Amino acid sequence: MTMRSLLRTPFLCGLLWAFCAPGARAEEPAASFSQPGSMGLDKNTVHDQEHIMEHLEGVINKPEAEMSPQELQLHYFKMHDYDGNNLLDGLELSTAITHVHKEEGSEQAPLMSEDELINIIDGVLRDDDKNNDGYIDYAEFAKSLQ
């Protein structure tokens, strides 16, 4: 597995956090997170519902138990859309990727190089930006999670 896909995986896993919601886990078998060819997705790299709710504290007043996986998915998207244009641009993707990378690594984790980060963002845009506008909109984001 290349360094690009190893670093891209945590970002995509962070995007898959909705599937770690307790209700979703009952419907989706845990084995689906580590099947061969699934880019190494596993429970250790996926952001959980509790982590998302920490970031949404004070923003969302609905209890997490009442939120559907789709609502959590939308809120995750919105919490990385810093300029509020309903699109994720390269900078917003970069911030999300480095956030995931920092939280998964130890304090001594090596910093991601600028070239590695650029390659990951380029890969995300190449694979998931279906209309080639340079942004990931919510429909593209949701489709990438299927």
From Swiss-Prot:
Molecular function in Gene Ontology: calcium ion binding
InterPro entries: EF-hand-dom_pair, EF_Hand_1_Ca_BS, EF_hand_dom, ER-Golgi_Adhesion_Reg
Pfam family, one: EF-hand_7
Domain of life: Eukaryota
Protein name, per record: Multiple coagulation factor deficiency protein 2
An annotated GO cellular component: Golgi apparatus
Entry annotated with the keyword Hydrolase: no
Signal peptide (residue range): 1-26
Modified residues (Phosphoserine): 106
